[in-house]
């Protein structure tokens, strides 16, 4: 053993040893990551003065393990035929390290490339399952000069040090411009990594990695026990920081090859696609190999990406603006043109509009690289098979507001059905899709809808996109079922023969027909097309019931009728002219929703995230008795507490929720949860953000305890719900689709304005 360590100075001299701290920042001088799945650096303890390691083993014991690790890594690396200088350096060490093989210790599983070593005694940490090589090509990577993760991390670090949105846009715009100029083929992966996604929402690609897997990977990669990692996490509350600190404290002989963007992105996608036997061990293996190539702040952002939260103020709308600015500047420079501020503003609007219609960077980014923003609207249009973002409605507290909003314009009232928003697509080649409001592909969940298409689609409808509500239907009595019945349907692997609750489509809009987008067609014309191309089929498909009303009395009557017909209330929409156009992703005042239950309350229900719970008392001692809920601020990527909820539950509800939530309990509050730090205000347990509940409240009030929309109305106070009541679980939405902080502030302002109007007997100000 002494022989190995006595030779380290000579290895440094002969092999031109380069310290990690001198790593070059110029992207063109970075090493590109290896083609194979193995790490290109060797870990050796460089300190002979330490008497004990952090995991309690003696220095000599640690050196024995690391010596054999060094042998196995070098032996594995001999299979690399790239002939790079790094491999030659490692081969020089192999001959010395092999002399120590007789120690009898087997390689620890913390070795990022030791999975091929089948010999040796067992170690305290089990060896991972052999991992197939990740597909990459080191030689091609080096020739192409791919972008590195280090450059992205530099941009992220700058963003973490500012809260100014314009600065954040400028930082990301500059970063994207550099990628366009130097590595255009990497732009798509860079965009996805910046928004922490692996593909379009409808692709269904999600990492789905829990804290336990990440902790285990960090521990095995850095030579620490799981208990040590848990202890560090409990202290700092950020696994990214734990990984960064652990990696920095890990001695290394050589700097690792730079982690390239394509290699990282492909690795994350492979993790997302892993399933079946031993998939957990395989995921850990990939994470370890990625960590072994990280330096500086890279481990922090890698781990945060795996967790699904970068914790930067990088909302997707910010990325869109930055990407538009970078694209406009790149093509202006390329064509020798000067870019004006007006050009930038127009470019931002073009990209926003196109992305709302066609939310797929897979299709948009290649066009941006090749042609810029000028022809984007003509090329990237609404397309069957790719879900567009749905148009949303504003809530209203009183029917008179409807008449005030629409004034003398023509409008229509439609039933608001109590079901699941469904965007139905039919392509020219006969493919059928059903997408949820958050672009999830629900086709496999609704095979009964798919097989009924021929009953309600007329032959002339060759391709189309419909906006509908999927509603539970009682086929025996031919009537609507409550949403709770529809929610009992399985979400995956649904077979028609096993379906107990059938779904019926209630269509209320058509967005695309036979090759033509209809978004800029007035609603009255879209409705005519809808009625001419489709026909009702009892229990399978029908049209949303509508009535064109003109007075408060007639609207009230239609509202009462909708409630009797098992609906939630009414949707009131502009019927003619440009204001009746369909606006994807926009919550517009040209659509208003009127719900019977909410006319005297907040004006709408809220969809809130379950983030904590309080143990029950009395009859509820065996379950959670109340819950801490929060709204979501997409700009700051924070979940902000809004209320403690303890009413509206049945005993069956509480039992079900306890069994669901106990599996996602976490040891401490997430660092992106905003809630009072006062001990008396803390819940008994905290949860991972996963479940979304619909909640109704009497009204809203300012609060020093709850942090919802803090800073929107008052700098030091948030907004809370008074007398909240549980309505239902929102299985059709992800937790990131929760009611936003901005919406909460709008509800509060509307409430204050309405109160002032009643008190003073004067019209409320438009902008309170």
UniProtKB/Swiss-Prot annotation:
It comes from the Eukaryota. The keyword Aminoacyl-tRNA synthetase does not apply. Its EC number is 6.5.1.1. Mg(2+) 2 binds at residue 568. Keywords: ATP-binding, Cell cycle, Cell division, DNA damage, DNA recombination, DNA repair, DNA replication, Ligase, Magnesium, Metal-binding, Nucleotide-binding, Nucleus. The keyword RNA-binding does not apply. GO terms for molecular function: ATP binding; DNA binding; DNA ligase (ATP) activity; DNA ligase activity; metal ion binding. InterPro entries: ATP-dep_DNA_ligase (IPR050191), DNA_ligase_ATP-dep (IPR000977), DNA_ligase_ATP-dep_C (IPR012309), DNA_ligase_ATP-dep_cent (IPR012310), DNA_ligase_ATP-dep_CS (IPR016059), DNA_ligase_ATP-dep_N (IPR012308), DNA_ligase_N_sf (IPR036599), NA-bd_OB-fold (IPR012340). The record marks 165, 438, 619, 644 as: Interaction with target DNA. ATP binds at residues 414, 421, 437, 573, 587, 593. It is found in: Nucleus. Its cofactor is Mg(2+). The gene is cdc17. Belongs to the ATP-dependent DNA ligase family. It is an enzyme of class 6 (ligase). Gene3D superfamilies: 3.30.1490.70, DNA ligase, ATP-dependent, N-terminal domain, DNA ligase/mRNA capping enzyme, Nucleic acid-binding proteins. Residues 42-139 are annotated as: Disordered. It catalyses: ATP + (deoxyribonucleotide)n-3'-hydroxyl + 5'-phospho-(deoxyribonucleotide)m = (deoxyribonucleotide)n+m + AMP + diphosphate. One of its GO terms (biological process) is nucleotide-excision repair. DNA ligase that seals nicks in double-stranded DNA during DNA replication, DNA recombination and DNA repair. Residues 104-124 have a biased composition (Low complexity). One of its GO terms (cellular component) is mitochondrion. Residues 52-99 have a biased composition (Basic and acidic residues). This is DNA ligase 1. Mg(2+) 1 binds at residue 469.
